[in-house]
Structure formats: C-alpha cells, structure tokens
Amino acid sequence: MENSSVRGAATYAGVALVAALLGAAAMWMHAEKRVNAARSQSTDAVTTHGEWVKIKRGKDTIRAYVAYPERKTKAPAVIVIHEIFGLTDWEPTVADRLAKEGFVAIVPDLLSSRHGQSPKNQDEARKLIGELDPDSITADLNAVYAYVNGLPAVEKDHIGTIGFCWGGGQSFRYATNNPNLKAVVVAYGPPPDSAAIKRIQAPVLGVYGENDERIDATLPDVAAKMEAAGKTFTHEVYPGTGHGFLKPGRQGSDGPQVQKAWDRILEFYRARLGK
C-alpha cells in the first residue's frame, strides 16, 4: 500500500513537471510570435537575420534572441539587457537596430532560467525581477557572454553591453564582474556599489534623460568615484527627455534626442569594439 502511494505521488509529480514544462514552452512560443510580429513592423529587421536560441547554464536554460548583420567579416557583439518589465517586444528591435549597424546583438530573457516563462504583465515582471539575486544574474550573463563569444560570426573578445532602466544598472554592475568587456553602455540605470567600481575595466558611457532626477542625482557622485578609481566614464544628459526615453511611449521618445543618443552610442561602440 505504501509503495502504491509512493508511486502515485511520483507519477503526480512527473505529470506536474511535464505540464509545467509544456506550459513554459507554450508561453515562450507565444512571446516569440508576439516579438516576431513586432519585428515585422521594423525596417531594421529587413536587413538583418534574427533567431531564437536556448543557452544552457548548468541545469537551467536561458532563452535569448540573436540578431546578425549582413556582412562578410566577423562582427563585434553587444549583449542587450532588458528593463525591469522583462523581455518585451521592444528589446529584440534594439538588437535588430544594432545588427543593422554591423553588430551581432543578443537579448537574453533573464527571467527564463529562474522561472521558465514570460511574465503575464508588468506587475508580475517587477515581482519576478525582484526575486532574482545578483549572483544568478551574473551567472546568466556569463553564460550569454560565453555563448556569443563562441559564435563563428563574432570577433572574439570584442563584446560590449547595453542595458535600459533596471538593465542599465545590470549593465553597469556586470562591468564590475566581467573584466573582459570592452564597452559598457548604461541607459538611465543606477550605478554599482562604490567598492565594486574599482573592478571595472571597460570604458562606460551613460545615457540619461533630463527629467529623471532619481537617477541623475547619482551622476556627480558616480563620476567622481569613477575618476578617482582611474576609470573611463562619460555621460550625456538629453534635454526634454525622461526616464526610459529610448523606448517608444516614454517622455521624449518621439523627439530628436533619441537619434542623437543612438548616434552617440554607436560612435562609442565603433571606437571601442570596432566596426
């Protein structure tokens, strides 16, 4: 009788696991279809090749979107780190934009390895993001770095990052943990701990909105600490824009400052990563 109960419990657990995996797979497929539909509206996607990949990290799997430029030679690469809302329709279009400019770009879903599915809404995304621990995020980014650095189309060790909002903070923080990065872009993200700044090896470019005092108030302090530590930190504050202005629907996102910011970002990458 006891063995029967154990077998029954094991069977139930197995069925539950399969159901969870199938549910996660269905969520991934739905999210990918949604993103692909958004990409179809972007002119950048016409001149690039994009695909979804799964990256193993121990027993976990990281879902990611990779965009490739149309070029004959190997390309530098950029890791794109999403906002606090998780991987949305927008970040893959950022990857397409970078690919159109000659870079291989990869966007990992940093919730996929921990939770196996995309959040249903922004509130759930914030909650799930809040449950991620820094070491896990670093491990995921290390796996993504190793993956993209091993791609035949990528110029080995010519890799940078860009992150937005929460992802901007992660881009800055990841620079303290990966000395091999060659260029780091922080789009309106918070700085890392003061002690960690000493570990940064890559030059850092900050992109900020004028009407974002919560983040902008940290700039004098972080600039002073980066300079004192002998690190390269340049930043631009764009007039008439708010937090998140590089993403459609945010304050200033429909103005000329967006193109100016992207021009500066691309100039920085070409100088630090190559063309």
Give the ranges of each region predicted by the language model.
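Short beta-strand/loop motif that positions the catalytic acidic residue
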Residues: 200, 206-208
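Serine-hydrolase catalytic machinery in alpha/beta-hydrolase-like enzymes
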Residues: 39-46, 52-150, 247-249
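C-terminal catalytic histidine-bearing segment of alpha/beta-hydrolase fold enzymes
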Residues: 227, 232-275
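Generic structural signal for well-ordered alpha-helices
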Residues: 141-145, 219, 223, 266
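An N-terminal hydrophobic leader/cap segment in hydrolases
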Residues: 4-55, 62-65
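Primarily recognizes the serine-hydrolase "nucleophile elbow" in alpha/beta-hydrolase
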Residues: 141-201
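Active-site loop/turn elements of alpha/beta-hydrolase fold enzymes
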Residues: 103, 110, 189, 238-240
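Acidic catalytic loop of the alpha/beta-hydrolase fold
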Residues: 211-216
